[in-house]
Structure formats: structure tokens, C-alpha cells
UniProtKB/Swiss-Prot annotation:
PANTHER family: CDK5 REGULATORY SUBUNIT-ASSOCIATED PROTEIN 1 (PTHR43020), MITOCHONDRIAL TRNA METHYLTHIOTRANSFERASE CDK5RAP1 (PTHR43020:SF2). PROSITE patterns: MTTASE_N, MTTASE_RADICAL, RADICAL_SAM, TRAM. Catalyzes the methylthiolation of N6-(dimethylallyl)adenosine (i(6)A), leading to the formation of 2-methylthio-N6-(dimethylallyl)adenosine (ms(2)i(6)A) at position 37 in tRNAs that read codons beginning with uridine. Monomer. Keywords: 4Fe-4S, Cytoplasm, Iron, Iron-sulfur, Metal-binding, S-adenosyl-L-methionine, Transferase, tRNA processing. This is tRNA-2-methylthio-N(6)-dimethylallyladenosine synthase. Its main location: cytoplasm. Binds 2 [4Fe-4S] clusters. One cluster is coordinated with 3 cysteines and an exchangeable S-adenosyl-L-methionine.
């Protein structure tokens, strides 16, 4: 009888990536097959996130539901992982004694051993340690699920922003060696992946070891990824302004595989608030990066993160944030009301901004961003955009859906053989969360991948000088 695994995931793209790797790992070691139905599962895993307010209570609420399943099936294994587990492991054990496994973001690769241990002596297992590189050494073989894929290149963060739990829950920065990253991406490309999204809590701080023992830079890595046959688009998430060096900007100038869209969190437009947040950069320095980026790639669009109502934020501070939003002309944002995360320095600050004021500021900020995003979308009306077709549309299963380079979802009429390929689409309609278009050119008509024989290359490139001596001219 097939054993089944159910994973519930909350939070960031890194958590989504971790969950997919857990599923692949437990399939390889124990033969567990994923199921969307918790009642069918032999193992239940909750991959948690501590960024949102009341994250801990959300975890216990979910565990309470699963407790009922365990009462019906005592052999059921329940595991809690992710950032809440790392932060609140002992509390979870005390309050939810029926949980069998508690693991942190850096120990998910040890799940097979943990499950074996629980199956053996029924004793609970808690492992929320921070082994430096071991997790990367034990990743399962990559498995493509469509034309796009996430690839983790580093973990953790050394920035210690005063509001953020990441350094405490995921540890300090650890970079994967470049060879491991490139091999994983090459394997994915061989399975039909056309776009990769490089992941890290502070991805542009990557400093991985190269094959010759030297330390590479993120700019080096981007160029190496772009050289992999089959990879046509590169994205990365999430960056820190302080690590956004000029050599990365130069990659935007000369590497077309790197998309014209960047998510670069700023959090506030007030230098005073940025200092309280421990961001180590000013609003002017942030704008200087954007100015250089647009000089290198004029059509690039920028999204960002904002926290409103941070302790001590005045009306003037908020107005400076709104000015920055207008100056940069952000295309999109993830914006939140400040809520203290236990164990962070900001949790000890006086939360002196009234709740209603926070809500009002968030509304104003989001309305402005939405207006700017719609203006960007309207500029695309009537233009031809290259779409990577990801699958059927969520709105209409008789239509296809894909993304533009600037991360817009486009729905259009097409045929199944277009999935996984590029099409050029004329944008005909603009909506708040998507675009609509009609196909004007398929990938077969683009000449993107023209197979050539060695003889044809020689015939095309062979030249002779005036003495009749042959040479090659690429």
C-alpha cells in the first residue's frame, strides 16, 4: 500500500522550495507520495513562517485540527518545521505534546532519519540546529514541474535588521558552491526548464566557492547561469540594497537572460526610520542604485517591500516614503503594518503609532502602488510581449497563461503544445491583476533554437585572407 505525505506550507518562496525538496527527499528514501488530503496521509508536515502577525497562534490552530486525525490514527506522524519551529520549538513540544518531529529550516534534510527514529521508539525528535553546508550536500535530485524552477543558492542573513527574525531562525549566510548550483540548473534545463529563479534571504550576498577554490561573486554566478544551454530567463529573490554592487548592475547591461524586473526591498523612505530598522543604507543611496540600473537597462521595472507604522514613524517619515514611491515609480510592492516579532530588537521598541493610523497609511501606500502598477500595465497595451507559457489559465481552463519578462500574468487562447515554450503576444486588455492578449508568433517562428551541423558552422564562419590562408571568424 502506498504511503502518503501531506505538506502544508506557509510563507516565502524559500519555504515553498524547501517543501518541494522535502517531498522529493521522502519519496526517494521512504516512497512517500504527496497528497492534498490530510486525512489520507501517513505523515503530516507543517512548514511554518514567522513573518506574519500571530504566526504562532496560527500554527497551534492548525495543529489542533491535526490532533483530531492523530486521535483516530495513533501511527500518524506529525512534524512542524520552518521558522516558527526554529523559534518556538520547546514551546511547541510543551503545548502540543502529540507533535512527533520539530525541525528547523536548516535540518529538513534530516527528516528521513527523524521519521525512522519516531517509527522505531515513538520518542519525539527535536532538531533545530544550524549545520552550515550539510543541507545543501543532501538535496535530492532536482525534478522539474513545468518550465520555471526555483533554485536555492544560499541560506540565512547577516544583516540583522531590527524587525527581522531570519538571522535567528535560518542562521547566518551560507552560500552553496557554484558547481553545485550550476549542475542543478543544468539538470533542470535538461528536463525542459527555461526560467530559473535564484533564491536566498539575501541572494545578492552570495559568495560561493568556485571549482578552483576561489570565491565567486553574485555577478559571476549570474553570467555562468546565463551560459547554461536551455536557460533563457533568470530571476532572483530577495536582494539587499547594501549588496547591490556595480558589477551586478553591469550584468543587466550585457546579459539579456536576466529579466527586466527586480524586487529590491527598501522598507521606508525615511533615513531616520531606516536607521531605526538597522537597514545600513539611506533613501538617496537606494535611489542611486535604481538610477544606475535604469541607465544599464532602461526598461527595468522595480518592486519593493514596505513596513508602515514602524515604532517612531511620524507623519513626516511616512510622507518621505510616499515621495520615494513616486520618485522610483515602483511597479509593485509587498507592504505590511509593523508587528513586533518576539526576540528581535524592534520588539523592545515603543510601538507608538496608533493602529488606525497604521491601517490608514497602509491603505494610502497600497493605493498609490496600485495606481502606478496599473499605469505600467496600460503602457503595455498594444505592445507585443514575449511570454513563457506556464500552463492553463486559472480563470479559464480552455485558455493558456504565462508571464512577461516584467512578471505580468497574461491569459490568451492557445494550443497545448505551446506550454513550456515562448510565444509573442499582443496585449489587448489590461486588468488589475492580469493582462489579456492574442498570439502573434510562436517559438518555432522566432528562430530561437536553430540546430546547426559542424559543417554548416564551418561554411558560415570560414574565411580566407588574400593569400588563400583559411581562418575562422565567428
Amino acid at each position: 500500500m502506498t504511503k502518503k505525505l501531506h505538506i502544508k506550507t506557509w510563507g516565502c518562496q524559500m519555504n515553498e522550495y524547501d517543501s518541494s525538496k522535502m517531498a522529493d527527499l521522502l519519496d526517494a528514501t521512504h516512497g512517500y507520495q504527496l497528497t492534498d488530503v490530510a486525512e489520507e496521509a501517513d505523515v503530516l508536515l507543517l512548514n511554518t513562517c514567522s513573518i506574519r502577525e500571530k504566526a504562532q497562534e496560527k500554527v497551534f490552530h492548525q495543529l489542533g485540527r491535526w490532533r483530531l486525525l492523530k486521535e483516530k490514527n495513533p501511527d500518524l506522524i506529525i512534524g512542524v518545521g520552518g521558522c516558527v519551529a526554529s523559534q518556538e520549538g520547546e514551546h511547541i513540544r510543551q503545548r502540543a505534546h502529540y507533535v512527533d518531529i520539530i525541525f528547523g529550516p536548516q535540518t529538513s534534510h534530516r527528516l528521513p532519519e527523524m521519521i525512522n527514529s519516531v517509527r522505531g521508539d515513538r520518542s519525539p525528535v527535536v532538531d533545530i540546529s544550524f549545520p552550515e553546508i550539510e543541507k545543501f550536500d543532501r538535496l535530492p535530485e532536482p525534478r522539474a514541474e513545468g518550465p520555471t524552477a526555483f533554485v536555492s543558492i544560499m541560506e540565512g542573513c547577516n544583516k540583522y535588521c531590527t524587525y527581522c527574525v531570519v538571522p535567528y531562525t535560518r542562521g547566518e549566510e551560507v552560500s552553496r558552491p557554484s558547481d553545485d548550483i550550476l549542475f542543478e540548473i543544468a539538470q533542470l534545463a535538461a528536463q525542459g526548464v527555461r526560467e530559473v529563479n535564484l533564491l536566498g534571504q539575501n541572494v545578492n550576498a552570495w559568495r560561493g566557492e568556485n571549482y578552483d577554490g576561489t570565491t565567486g561573486t553574485f555577478a559571476d554566478l549570474l553570467r555562468l547561469v546565463a551560459a547554461i544551454d536551455g536557460i533563457d530567463r533568470i530571476r532572483f529573490t530577495t536582494s539587499h540594497p547594501i549588496e547591490f554592487t556595480d558589477d551586478i548592475i553591469e550584468v543587466y547591461r550585457d546579459t539579456p537572460e536576466l529579466v527586466s524586473f527586480l524586487h529590491l526591498p527598501v522598507q521606508s523612505g525615511s533615513d531616520r526610520v531606516l536607521n531605526l530598522m538597522g537597514r545600513t543604507h539611506t533613501a538617496l543611496e537606494y535611489k542611486a542604485i535604481i538610477r544606475k540600473l535604469r541607465a544599464a537597462r532602461p526598461d527595468i521595472q522595480i518592486s519593493s517591500d514596505f513596513i508602515v507604522g514602524f515604532p517612531g514613524e511620524t507623519t513626516d517619515d511616512f510622507e518621505k516614503t510616499m515621495k520615494l514611491i513616486a520618485d522610483v515609480n515602483f511597479d509593485m510592492s509587498y507592504s505590511f503594518i509593523f508587528s513586533a516579532r518576539p526576540g528581535t530588537p524592534a520588539a523592545d521598541m515603543v510601538d507608538d503609532v496608533p493602529e488606525e493610523e497604521k491601517k490608514q497609511r497602509l491603505y494610502i501606500l497600497q493605493e498609490r502602488i496600485n495606481q502606478q502598477a496599473m499605469a505600467w500595465s496600460r503602457r503595455m497595451l498594444g505592445t507585443t510581449q514575449r511570454i513563457l507559457v506556464e500552463g492553463t489559465s486559472r480563470k479559464n481552463i480552455m485558455e493558456l497563461s504565462g508571464r512577461t519578462e516584467n512578471n505580468r500574468v497574461v491569459n490568451f487562447e492557445g494550443t497545448p503544445e505551446m506550454i513550456g515554450k515562448f510565444v509573442d503576444v499582443e496585449i489587448t486588455d489590461v486588468y488589475p491583476n492580469s493582462l489579456r492578449g492574442k498570439v502573434v508568433r510562436t517559438e518555432d517562428e522566432m528562430g530561437l533554437r536553430v540546430a546547426e551541423t559542424p559543417e554548416s558552422v564551418i561554411a558560415r564562419t570560414r574565411k580566407e585572407n588574400e593569400l588563400g590562408v583559411g581562418f575562422y571568424q565567428p
